[in-house]
């Protein structure tokens, strides 16, 4: 439930996810947020019940690849495409390791203590 607008006006889903389908210099932000691209991202949130793993780059790289495949955003910086191409295998392995560490931490430090996340619709 956030976004980033870079200095060129490209509206990205996150400061670290350098992909966009629209630019605020060409379209109102309200319209951009209702685009199929942003709707697809919101439909997948939270990406995981474990709120320690909210990122579509580090924690759930498959989601970033799916969204890019479905909506064909343009990269907003040089090298952005490597996240959904060249680095896919390494990111998938890293995500598995992150889950191996953070899932038990989530269970122990949050679920076991009765924490129930309140999701924003």
Label every model-predicted segment.
Residues 1:
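Structured beta-strand/loop patches that form or line metal/cofactor-binding pockets in enzymes
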Residues 16-121:
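Flexible mid-to-C-terminal extensions adjoining Fe-S/redox cofactors in radical SAM and related proteins
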């Amino acid at each position: 439930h956030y976004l980033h607008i870079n200095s060129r006006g490209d509206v990205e889903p996150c400061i670290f996810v350098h992909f966009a389908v629209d630019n605020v210099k060409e379209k109102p932000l309200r319209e951009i947020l209702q685009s199929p691209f942003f709707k697809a991202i919101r439909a997948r949130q939270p990406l995981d019940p474990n709120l320690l793993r909210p990122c579509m780059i580090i924690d759930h790289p498959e989601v970033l690849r799916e969204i890019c495949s479905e909506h064909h955003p343009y990269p907003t910086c040089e090298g952005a495409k490597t996240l959904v191409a060249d680095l896919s295998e390494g990111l998938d392995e890293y995500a598995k390791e992150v889950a191996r560490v953070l899932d038990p931490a989530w269970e122990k430090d949050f679920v076991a203590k009765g924490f129930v996340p309140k999701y924003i619709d």
